């Protein structure tokens, strides 16, 4: 199954739609395939000690099957985050990009930030 999430989100009402979508995703059949277009950004630290984001590859059809049931999604500093769980079968991990540290709503859809 292929799903395209919102291209752009503005305001708390549309952010709630993201929360509802993630929750629905978590409680549906865990064997279903969930895919979404994502853009990855890596957090970097400059020589001066400034933190900046380096844009990564645009990955089409990333597999979200590993999103664990029971993941707690919440908003913190404008970023969507998920709780990392120890269950390997349902771990917040994508082989293509590593652990998902932050899920942010951006102009290209959902942006996943990794360390």
Curated annotation (Swiss-Prot):
Species assigned in the record = Bacillus subtilis (strain 168)
**Mind telling me what this protein is named?**
SPbeta prophage-derived uncharacterized protein YoqS
What superkingdom does the record give? Bacteria
